[in-house]
Amino acid sequence: MKQTVTSKRELEIVLLEQKRETTNQSKELLCPRQEESLIDLDSPQAQVVIGVRRSGKSTLCFQTLRNAGKTFAYVNFDDERLAGVGTAQLNDVLEVLYKVYGEFSHLFLDEIQDIEGWPLFVNRLLRQKMHVILTGSNAKLLSSDLATHLTGRSSEVSLYPFSFGEYCTMKAVDTHTMTTDKIAFRRAAFDDYALRGGFPELMHVKDGRRYVTDLVDNILRRDIEQRYHITYTAEFEALAHHLLNVSPTVVVTKDLAGTFSFKSAHTVANYIQYLKQAYLLVGVKKFSAKSKVRATQEKVYAVDVALMNQREDAYAGENLGWRLETLVLSHLIRKCKMEGWDVYYLSERYGECDFVVCCGNRVVQCIQVSYDISAYKTRKRELNGLMLAAKRTGCDDLLLLTDHHYEDMDDRGRTIKIRPVYEWTLEDE
């Protein structure tokens, strides 16, 4: 077992090893990410990249720095040898970094959220005109510290696992040529993506189930249980796996409290918030003019389909509709982050619509997702949900996403586009 560093010499050994690791990484085939354009390396603000573990945050920052030709130093605090580093030692870290790297204009601090006193340290660096890049895997810890100590001095970028377009780039799949063979290759790639998910390292590991199981366990124990001092860990983990198994699902905290023997619905609500802050789950609020409804009737999704199908004892592997809906949300949250839009779901007694996309108070698109609409009842139900959404919102941009169907149709005076999900996700690439 590696020991926590206690001297500058030991710190230098750790940082030299980390430097060698990043040098080796620079030789690997990397995928361009859309989020690279959102990182402003010339800004006086700290650039903060947050997202689920293993989504490629560090790689994105390395790519951005290297592509821009910046001189930078790097320290990864997600290293057990640096677990004891606190406020008093952060200046020692900076001193050793200058020794290891020489002069540098940018400082990349990876997974810094658990280091005591880091916001004050970063604030001092910014006052000294150092350009700082941060990554972290917990939205609350980063955001609360930033709000307290770095108000107006940080810019946040959210990163998610690979989109289907990025997956195709890494697999060298042609996403544009409209020939029979190229379309078939894209179709096959999407089937694989829908099963394996978008975590970058999953493309290179043989045992995907073991990888994802370990990833989820790591997030639950290190990013949540240890940080929030959760006592009943078995019950908490059972709740987390249940929500991943049944996602997408509308959260009813009172029912979950009874099922998992928690003392109150408030405890369940807190636990679900922790899961969202660690980016295991993504919440979608109900479309309503009433704030109370939006705040209480939330629908949760796994942040990536790998968390649904690739874990040991996963339940959702064969539920194709759930997987497709989750893939659509994964694409929507990326797109909406870029556009500054919000996503809701609509549910009433007379029907449902999976996604209502809003720009401020204006609804820009209503989207329904169904794996297969060949059955008359299924097709009618999905179209009725879209028509209900159109009536409630006044939106005329209506989209029905399926696994393979392509059609433009009129229904009750409105035009509905029916598209395969894999084609739709590539439109923005």
Where are these regions (language model features)?
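Walker A/P-loop
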Residues: 58
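Hydrophobic anchor at the beta1->P-loop junction of P-loop NTPases
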Residues: 49
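Interdomain motor-coupling "hinge/lid" segment immediately C-terminal to the ATP-binding subdomain
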Residues: 2-22, 145-250, 276
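Domain-level recognition of nuclease-like catalytic cores that cleave nucleotide substrates
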Residues: 403-429
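Structural recognition of the conserved hydrophobic beta-strand(s) that form the central parallel beta-sheet
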Residues: 131-137, 158
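Short glycine-rich substrate-engagement loop in P-loop NTPases that contacts/grips substrate
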Residues: 73-103
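Pre-Walker A adenine-sensing motif
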Residues: 24-41
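Accessory nucleic acid-recognition modules appended to NTPase machines
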Residues: 2-3, 204-363
